[in-house]
């Protein structure tokens, strides 16, 4: 079987279905693939293929996630759907499935439920820029006023988490009707309307290559007569020979110039997001740079030691801690390529964090790390992952 070539003729966007358990997220995912496949936008994927999602490991944490892809006239989409609530929490916090936008599924008969609220809150914390709502199972509600009340409740909930509740598209339908090919108005047509809303309301993300240059330093060596080389995988942007760079984190920020980019032992003029490269640096000694720092476009990122985080703490049976932790807990925080010790301060009113919780707290690191909001990290104790988190706000 030769692999199909991935043709990039449309902008790409990553989305996912979120919402309360049994409100129809997986059925909707199947309905989208089936409806768009009929219109020539990808392959139809059945419910049971999505539901038995494979397990993946991301930052030492096992997550079950199903990935499907499809196309509208406007975009190519990669779509994630998770079977369990804990998988969503882990996925959103570890950034395992980067979401540029989300489809919030709400059962019209139930209205917003606890996990509906939690997923919206997480979306806000991890920086999901836009949410579109699918009001599912509308054929199970006879009272039109009831549906209007639920819609109003969803808008208020979105607004309370700083999403534009009044402007958010809410599409009413039945994902099951679309899968079973009946009741076109609430079935197939609702899916077409939903995807139109997703196309228009979810903004096109900035591609990694269009962001400022950043490369986490993995290794450093000196080549006699040439200078110092830092190796790593370029996370974002483009680097060209002759451009200025900064070395940020751990110690005081230093400036240098890229005098060459190497890939597969060949010298290139430039490297871009996704490339594993060696970058030759002018006037930098072997000891001036170390793993844990980043090379970046000057003034694009700054080093910090204190931040607010949202984190998921592994349960005992996931290989996590057996006991809760309290303020003054001092694990290692693994950012990009390195562990840094930090101290946790829990918010007022939170006495402790139990294994299996997702929690908010403040961290103070012992050495500065180049960071910006939305940066993911693992929480480790002696090399063993006990949690994962995301920087939600930088303090100093």
UniProtKB/Swiss-Prot annotation:
Region span, G1: 19-26
Region (G5): 174-176
tr-type G domain residues: 10-206
Start and end residues of each stretch annotated as G3: 81-84
Cellular location(s): Cytoplasm
EC top class, as a word: hydrolase
Record's keyword annotation contains Metal-binding: yes
Keyword set, alphabetical order: Cytoplasm, Elongation factor, GTP-binding, Hydrolase, Magnesium, Metal-binding, Nucleotide-binding, Protein biosynthesis
G2: annotated span: 60-64
Protein name: Elongation factor Tu
Gene (UniProt): tuf
């Amino acid at each position: 079987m030769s692999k199909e070539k991935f043709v990039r003729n449309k902008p790409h966007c990553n989305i996912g279905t979120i919402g309360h358990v049994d409100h129809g997220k997986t059925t909707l995912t199947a309905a989208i693939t089936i409806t768009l496949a009929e219109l020539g936008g990808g392959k139809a994927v059945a419910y049971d293929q999505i539901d038995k999602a494979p397990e993946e490991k991301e930052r030492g944490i096992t997550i079950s996630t199903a990935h499907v892809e499809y196309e509208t006239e406007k975009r190519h989409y990669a779509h994630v759907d998770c079977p369990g609530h804990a998988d969503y929490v882990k996925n959103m916090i570890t950034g395992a499935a980067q979401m540029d936008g989300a489809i919030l599924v709400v059962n019209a008969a139930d209205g917003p439920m606890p996990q509906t609220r939690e997923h919206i809150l997480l979306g806000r914390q991890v920086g999901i820029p836009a949410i579109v709502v699918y009001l599912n199972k509308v054929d199970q509600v006879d009272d039109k006023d009831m549906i209007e009340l639920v819609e109003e409740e969803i808008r208020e909930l979105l607004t309370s988490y700083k999403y534009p509740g009044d402007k958010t598209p809410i599409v009413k339908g039945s994902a099951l009707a679309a899968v079973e090919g009946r009741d076109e108005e609430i079935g197939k047509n609702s899916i077409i309307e939903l995807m139109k809303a997703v196309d228009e309301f979810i903004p096109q993300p900035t591609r990694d290559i269009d962001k400022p240059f950043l490369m986490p330093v993995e290794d450093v060596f000196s080549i006699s007569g040439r200078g110092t080389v830092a190796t790593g995988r370029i996370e974002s942007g483009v680097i060209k020979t002759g451009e200025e760079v900064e070395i940020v984190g751990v110690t005081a920020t230093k400036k240098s110039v890229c005098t060459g980019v190497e890939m597969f032992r060949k010298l290139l003029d430039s490297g871009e997001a996704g490339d594993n490269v060696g970058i030759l640096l002018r006037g930098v000694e072997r000891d001036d740079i170390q793993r844990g720092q980043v090379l970046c476009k000057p003034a694009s990122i700054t080093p910090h030691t204190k931040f607010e985080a949202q984190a998921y703490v592994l349960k005992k049976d996931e290989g996590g801690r057996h006991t809760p932790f309290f303020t003054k807990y001092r694990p290692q925080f693994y950012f990009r390529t390195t562990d840094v010790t930090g101290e946790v301060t829990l918010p007022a009113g939170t006495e402790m964090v139990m294994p299996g919780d997702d929690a908010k707290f403040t961290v103070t690191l012992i050495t500065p790390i180049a960071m910006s909001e939305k940066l993911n990290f693992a929480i480790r104790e002696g090399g063993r992952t006990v949690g994962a988190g995301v920087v939600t706000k930088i303090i100093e």
